[in-house]
Amino acid sequence: MQPGVLAACLLLSWTHCWSLPLLNSNEDDDLSEEDFQFAESYLRSYYHPLNPAGILKKNAAGSMVDRLREMQSFFGLEVTGKLDDNTLAIMKQPRCGVPDVGEYNVFPRTLKWSQTNLTYRIVNYTPDLTHSEVEKAFKKAFKVWSDVTPLNFTRIHNGTADIMISFGTKEHGDFYPFDGPSGLLAHAFPPGPNYGGDAHFDDDETWTSSSKGYNLFLVAAHEFGHSLGLDHSKDPGALMFPIYTYTGKSHFMLPDDDVQGIQSLYGPGDEDPNPKHPKTPDKCDPSLSLDAITSLRGETMIFKDRFFWRLHPQQVDAELFLTKSFWPELPNRIDAAYEHPARDLIFIFRGKKFWAPNGYDILEGYPQKLSELGFPREVKKISAAVHFEDTGKTLFFSGNQVWSYDDTNHTMDQDYPRLIEEEFPGIGGKVDAVYEKNGYIYFFNGPIQFEYSIWSKRIVRVMPTNSLLWC
């Protein structure tokens, strides 16, 4: 039996070893006994401690707290060793069934295929899609990996393939039972004989070729990464990140983290059709520029490319998320954002459209057009926006101009637009992002931010953009 399969079986055999509550919570979080049971089951499934021989380290409460700390670190959360609302929310997101630690990295050798010509076979189909749609999704998913490596994938219709693909429910014959709708979506085994390379999909899910339900192509591309020998990635922008996020209808490009991982196993291919693979931003990059900033219920949301950093007022370390993991309906990248606290809304802009999220939910009737706010046709996008609660005014920045909007009358103020350089001397002719706090406006222009005093109407400090993220 393949060592990875043996480790998986040993892992599962200890799944129900503990019954006592082994975790503590933050006092401010109202968590139920069911929440603790769910969290402990999650940690046993995805953060089960194995030694190199594949044997469980039974250390009861201490071990479980260690697993929780490891899980919090893996997902970029504040590492407390205590169960809290943010940690539980991550645990409850739909995800891959392969453990985040242990199974792939307990063996001293690298798990990879010795040959570059691999076969796959579709054993059965989901009733959610036509046979043609399923076949197209799997073919496209394999192409994600063959585009950047020397690997070739050929479908066979009979016999045993290197990668056997099947749909099943609950206990389906491999000691890794599925759990019904949501939760665990699919799993795959590392390269090798027997189960090695095989990918299984939970047929209690609703599989689609769109944003509804779970997109089969995206889940399959992730699982086939495991079939080729990849672990889960800590990079929230990576395809191999364990949590499912629908990333949009546009042309899929394999992120750089995944390219580096798969090429470390198999090397590069002859010709990459997408030589520029998206990278996850580094918050401490000295040349960091931002797309948008807004507050949201006391937190600060800092947008860059497909991502945003979520900065809690009591924490130094910002958490990084894909924008679509919070708001699947939004574009991958945004231009501007601001909060309207009195309405408990944020407004998010991209091109000539804007959306109004209330928490995770976007209000009905959105997106709307910029013209609804009174912008003329020649305004193609908003580059930054900031709302002032005491005056009911919102400033919009577009190109080298600034506009003032009256939220009470729902009209643009007269004598606007004005030139940014004349209205706020010294900050330059454009604004990438802006926010207001304690009587100061913070303007971001490339790698520089300007602290501007509303009272004295002058710049009082100039700082690097990345200092906002404690760099």
UniProtKB/Swiss-Prot annotation:
<dbReference type="GO" id="GO:0030574">
    <property type="term" value="P:collagen catabolic process"/>
</dbReference>
<keyword id="KW-0479">Metal-binding</keyword>
<dbReference type="GO" id="GO:0004222">
    <property type="term" value="F:metalloendopeptidase activity"/>
</dbReference>
<protein>
    <recommendedName>
        <fullName>Collagenase 3</fullName>
        <ecNumber>3.4.24.-</ecNumber>
    </recommendedName>
</protein>
<feature type="binding site">
    <location>
        <position position="385"/>
    </location>
    <ligand>
        <name>Ca(2+) 5</name>
    </ligand>
</feature>
<feature type="disulfide bond">
    <location>
        <begin position="284"/>
        <end position="471"/>
    </location>
</feature>
<keyword id="KW-0732">Signal</keyword>
<keyword id="KW-0862">Zinc</keyword>
<dbReference type="InterPro" id="IPR033739">
    <property type="entry name" value="M10A_MMP"/>
</dbReference>
<feature type="binding site">
    <location>
        <position position="205"/>
    </location>
    <ligand>
        <name>Ca(2+) 3</name>
    </ligand>
</feature>
<dbReference type="GO" id="GO:0008270">
    <property type="term" value="F:zinc ion binding"/>
</dbReference>
<feature type="binding site">
    <location>
        <position position="172"/>
    </location>
    <ligand>
        <name>Zn(2+) 1</name>
    </ligand>
</feature>
<feature type="binding site">
    <location>
        <position position="184"/>
    </location>
    <ligand>
        <name>Ca(2+) 3</name>
    </ligand>
</feature>
<feature type="binding site">
    <location>
        <position position="174"/>
    </location>
    <ligand>
        <name>Zn(2+) 1</name>
    </ligand>
</feature>
<feature type="repeat" description="Hemopexin 3">
    <location>
        <begin position="379"/>
        <end position="427"/>
    </location>
</feature>
<feature type="region of interest" description="Interaction with TIMP2">
    <location>
        <begin position="176"/>
        <end position="246"/>
    </location>
</feature>
<dbReference type="InterPro" id="IPR021158">
    <property type="entry name" value="Pept_M10A_Zn_BS"/>
</dbReference>
<feature type="binding site">
    <location>
        <position position="293"/>
    </location>
    <ligand>
        <name>Ca(2+) 5</name>
    </ligand>
</feature>
<feature type="binding site">
    <location>
        <position position="182"/>
    </location>
    <ligand>
        <name>Ca(2+) 3</name>
    </ligand>
</feature>
<keyword id="KW-0272">Extracellular matrix</keyword>
<feature type="glycosylation site" description="N-linked (GlcNAc...) asparagine">
    <location>
        <position position="152"/>
    </location>
</feature>
<keyword id="KW-1015">Disulfide bond</keyword>
<keyword id="KW-0677">Repeat</keyword>
<feature type="signal peptide">
    <location>
        <begin position="1"/>
        <end position="19"/>
    </location>
</feature>
<keyword id="KW-0325">Glycoprotein</keyword>
<keyword id="KW-0378">Hydrolase</keyword>
<dbReference type="Pfam" id="PF00045">
    <property type="entry name" value="Hemopexin"/>
</dbReference>
<keyword id="KW-0865">Zymogen</keyword>
<feature type="binding site">
    <location>
        <position position="232"/>
    </location>
    <ligand>
        <name>Zn(2+) 2</name>
    </ligand>
</feature>
<feature type="binding site">
    <location>
        <position position="187"/>
    </location>
    <ligand>
        <name>Zn(2+) 1</name>
    </ligand>
</feature>
<dbReference type="InterPro" id="IPR036375">
    <property type="entry name" value="Hemopexin-like_dom_sf"/>
</dbReference>
<keyword id="KW-0597">Phosphoprotein</keyword>
<feature type="binding site">
    <location>
        <position position="240"/>
    </location>
    <ligand>
        <name>Zn(2+) 2</name>
    </ligand>
</feature>
<feature type="propeptide" description="Activation peptide">
    <location>
        <begin position="20"/>
        <end position="103"/>
    </location>
</feature>
<feature type="binding site">
    <location>
        <position position="179"/>
    </location>
    <ligand>
        <name>Ca(2+) 3</name>
    </ligand>
</feature>
<feature type="binding site">
    <location>
        <position position="194"/>
    </location>
    <ligand>
        <name>Ca(2+) 2</name>
    </ligand>
</feature>
<feature type="binding site">
    <location>
        <position position="226"/>
    </location>
    <ligand>
        <name>Zn(2+) 2</name>
    </ligand>
</feature>
<feature type="binding site">
    <location>
        <position position="196"/>
    </location>
    <ligand>
        <name>Ca(2+) 2</name>
    </ligand>
</feature>
<feature type="binding site">
    <location>
        <position position="198"/>
    </location>
    <ligand>
        <name>Ca(2+) 2</name>
    </ligand>
</feature>
<feature type="binding site">
    <location>
        <position position="205"/>
    </location>
    <ligand>
        <name>Ca(2+) 1</name>
    </ligand>
</feature>
<feature type="region of interest" description="Disordered">
    <location>
        <begin position="263"/>
        <end position="284"/>
    </location>
</feature>
<dbReference type="InterPro" id="IPR036365">
    <property type="entry name" value="PGBD-like_sf"/>
</dbReference>
